Structures are given as structure tokens and as C-alpha cells.
Amino acid sequence: MSQKMAKEGPRLSKNQKFSEHFSIHCCPPFTFLNSKREIVDRKYSICKSGCFYQKKEEDWICCACQKTSRRATSPQRPKHQPAASPVVVRAPPAKPKSPLMPAKPRSPPRPAKPRSPSRTERQPRPRPEVRPPPAKQKPPQKSKQPARSSPLRGPGTSRGGSPTRAPRFW
């Protein structure tokens, strides 16, 4: 733990421009790794977040966590963590489901189940299509309101304004 902390440098401020200090080369995780999980292009390295920018020959900066770190063996450890964590998390829930469902040989019902939710998803889709027409009716109502207010203003001002209206209100 202490070794990793020592290798990682301070976080860069959001205002700092990466291009001014070092070249930016972002790559998705495992893009530049071969089957043996060895880095093919030494200009790239991988951190916990899955990507590094190159700062210097020995220093790297991550495009996600924005931490600088050295090439050492640290990039190899994070490679296993992101790949193993989702697999381990997904595997345990899958195992309890299989013993709970005694109908393992019945494969046809399983594909039918995903189809039924898709039908339920399709039903709400037409509903939003029906909603837009009422929205179109609202703008004409708004246009009527200013039309009503404008004639009221027009005659009031044309009648002389203050001298004519003053005796009426008083």
C-alpha cells in the first residue's frame, strides 16, 4: 500500500492543460496488451482506471484519475483487478440462480422470458407518441391569450389614456 502511494504523484488541477506539458495518447484498457498481458507499446501504460497518459519516459498520468505514476510493476497489478472484479461479482449471483431453478434442461422457456419483458418495454413506447399531440394544442391557447390582451390595451390607449380613464376610476 505504501509503495503504491509513493509511486503515485499529486493530482493535476482541472485547469492544467495536458497538451502543454506532455503528449496525450489515450487508449481503452488492454488495447496495447498482447496475449501474455505484456505492454506492446511502451508509450502506454494502464492504471486502476484503465488508461494512462504519457508524461515523461518514466512517468505516466492517468486520463481518468489524473494521477501521475511511474512505469515500475504497478501497472500490472491494476490490470488484474478491473478484469477480475466484474467476473467475481457476476459469478456468485449466477451460481445461486442455477440451483434455485430446477428447470435447467428446459432451455426454451428461458429465451421466452427475455422476450416477454421486451414486449412490456414496447408498450410504454407508443404512449409517449400519443402525448405530443396535446402538447401541440397548448401553443394555440397561448397565442389566444396575447391576442385578447392586445385589443384591451389598444382601445384604452386610443381613448386618450389618463384624462378619460381618471374620472372613471375616481
Swiss-Prot record:
Subcellular location, record wording: Cytoplasm, Perinuclear region
Region annotation 3 X 9 AA approximate tandem repeats: where it falls in the sequence: 93-115
Biased composition (Basic and acidic residues): 118-130
Gene Ontology CC, one term: mitochondrion
Gene Ontology MF term list: structural constituent of myelin sheath
Record region (Disordered): 69-170
Keywords noted in UniProt: Cytoplasm, Phosphoprotein, Repeat
Low complexity composition-biased segments: 82-92, 138-151
Chief site of localization: cytoplasm
Modified residues (Phosphoserine): 85, 98, 107
Record carries keyword DNA repair: no
Disulfide bonds: none
Top-level taxon of the source organism: Eukaryota
Signal sequence extent: none
Residues in Sequence repeats: 93-101, 105-110, 111-115
Function of the molecule: May play a role in compacting or stabilizing the myelin sheath possibly by binding the negatively charged acidic phospholipids of the cytoplasmic membrane.
Name listed for the protein in its UniProt record: Myelin-associated oligodendrocyte basic protein
Organism taxonomic ancestry: Eukaryota, Metazoa, Chordata, Craniata, Vertebrata
Gene name per UniProt: Mobp
